[in-house]
Curated annotation (Swiss-Prot):
GO terms (BP aspect): bacterial-type flagellum-dependent cell motility
Listed Pfam families: FlaA
Entry annotated with the keyword Disulfide bond: no
Subcellular location: Periplasmic flagellum; Periplasm
Assembly, per entry: The flagellum consists of an outer layer composed of repeating units of FlaA around a core that contains one or all of five antigenically related polypeptides.
Coiled coil: none
GO cellular component annotations of the record: outer membrane-bounded periplasmic space; periplasmic flagellum
Species the sequence originates in: Spirochaeta aurantia
Protein's name in the database: Flagellar filament outer layer protein
Signal peptide per UniProt: 1-21
Amino acid sequence: MKRFFAILGAALFVGNSGAFAEQATLIDFSKLVGEGNTGLHAPTTIDYSRQAGSAYSAEDKAAMKISLAIPSWEIELASSSQTVENQTLSLVTAAPVKQDAARYGGETVMGVRIHFPSFGINSFAVIKPPFTIPAYATLGDATAQNAVAGGQFDGFGVLKNVGVIKSIQINILGRNYLNRLSLLLEDQNGDEREIVMGYLNFDGWKSLQWNNPNYQTEVRNRDLQIVPLYPRSAPLIKLKGIKIHRDGSQEGGDIVSYIKDIKVIYDQAVVDRNSDVDDEAIWGILRQREEQYRNFELAKLGNLQVLRSLEKKKMAKEADFDQAAPAAAAARAPATN
C-alpha cells in the first residue's frame, strides 16, 4: 500500500514544486444511465461483433455491443459463496433517487443487492464492470469531431496523470450493515491495490473517505527526482471493482446499498508545460503500448459475450408449463353421467 501511493508519483514528481493536488471524479454512476431501447451508455459502448463467426446474422451482430451502463455491471462472489441461489440473488440495477431527496434528488445511482451464505463464513463480493476498462480506448472514429484520442473512458473509471494520491472518497447509501467496503484500483503497470474505505454501519448517504497516511504536505520533505517525460511519465489509475466483505460472525443473507460516485484528490504527476508539440498526437506511443493488451481483453470480452448470446438463444423461453394443452384435452374428453 505504502509503495503504491508513496513511491508512485513521488518518483514521478519531476522535481517541480509547481505540481499541485486537484480533485477529479474517477466514476459517477449517475452518468452511466442506459439510453433508448438498447439500454447502452453511448460514450462507453464497445462493439464486440468482430469476435462472432459467420453463422451470426447481421441483425445479431448489430446487437453485439456492451457499455458501462449500470445494469451491465456484475457481482462476483467469493468461490466458496458461488451457489446458484447466491449468484441469482446478487445483482446490480439502476436505482432512481426520489425527487425530494436531500441529496442527489432526481438522479439515478447504482443499486446493489448481494446475497451472502446464511451460514457463518468469511466471504466477499466484487462489484465489477462488464469488461476491463481500457485506459487508451477511442470512441468510434478517431477522426470524429468530438472524439478524444485515447480518452473514451477518462472520467468513466480512468484518471490520468495521477501522481501521489492524497484522498479517495466514495458517496454511498448505507442500511446499517456491518460489512466493510474497499476499492480495487489498478495503475499503469497493471499492479492492483485494495484500499479499505470503511464500514457500512450507517443509515442514509455518507461520504466514506480514505486519506493517504504517507502524503507529504511539505515539498521539502518529499523525495524529488528528475525523470524523463514523454512517454515515460504516464501514471494513471483505473477502477477494477468495489469489494464488500462479509465476516463469518456477521448475519448472512441479503445486503442492499446504493453508490453515487468515487472521487480522488491527487497530485499531478507532470505539470502541464503548455508544450508547443503534442507528443502523443504525433507518436501515439502510449496508445500503442496498451493496444496489444487492450485487444486481448476485448477479444476475451467478445468471446464471452458471444457465448452468452448463444447460450441465451438456447435457454428455455417458457416460464411454466402450457396450460392450454391440458384445457384442450379436458374439452375433448367424453362427458360422463
